[in-house]
């Protein structure tokens, strides 16, 4: 999955939030521009301003932008904290957010939490609760790749938790859906030895 594309998508979504106060709009726009330019210090400053807004939607978008800034810098613990605050504050919940939360938890080796986020994102995708991915991706390709990544990571989480039966089952289901994935074929072979 091209995570850079995912980051830009999330940043663009941040700009789409309705803003009334020009200061808020400027912070969102400046934060997105700084993030896209790789100026993480400036992006962080702008998104932090946005988190201080009294309007919960604006504040939530600030936390999401802040999370993306941390994520891009591979500060996964801080990114996960910011994503949690975004969700708690009322950001529009999408499969993408739960995928990124799952990746952050995996990077910090909290596989139980990662599994919860991944499964929440997959459930959301299956019931099409968010609908955001289809609207915001070119012909759904990005969304399909993200779902595949999440299913792969679900197997990895079960493996890291030494839950061999669930890992085997999910690997088998994955290979039915994605039969040409040689990495998962090797993973499934390994799991059969457990």
Give the positions of each predicted feature.
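Start-of-helix register in tetratricopeptide repeats
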Residues: 25-26, 59-61, 68, 95-96, ...
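Flexible helix-coil transition and linker loops at the boundaries of alpha-helical arrays
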Residues: 51-60, 87-94, 124-144
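Canonical tetratricopeptide repeat
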Residues: 65, 99-100, 146, 153, ...
């Amino acid at each position: 999955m091209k995570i850079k594309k995912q980051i830009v998508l999330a940043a663009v979504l941040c700009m789409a939030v309705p803003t009334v106060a020009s200061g808020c709009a400027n912070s969102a726009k400046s934060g997105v521009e700084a993030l896209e330019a790789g100026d993480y210090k400036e992006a962080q400053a702008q998104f932090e301003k946005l988190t201080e807004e009294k309007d919960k939607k604006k504040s939530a978008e600030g936390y999401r932008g802040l999370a993306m800034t941390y994520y891009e810098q591979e500060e996964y613990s801080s990114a996960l904290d910011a994503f949690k605050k975004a969700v708690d504050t009322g950001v529009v919940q999408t499969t993408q957010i739960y995928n990124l939360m799952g990746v952050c938890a995996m990077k910090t080796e909290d596989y139980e939490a990662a599994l919860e986020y991944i499964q929440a994102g997959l459930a959301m995708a299956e019931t099409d609760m968010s609908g955001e991915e289809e609207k915001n991706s070119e012909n759904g390709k990005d969304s399909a790749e993200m779902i595949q990544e999440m299913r792969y990571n679900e197997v990895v989480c079960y493996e890291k938790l030494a839950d061999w039966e669930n890992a085997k089952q999910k690997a088998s289901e994955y290979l039915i859906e994605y039969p040409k994935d040689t990495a998962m074929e090797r993973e499934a072979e390994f799991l059969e030895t457990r």
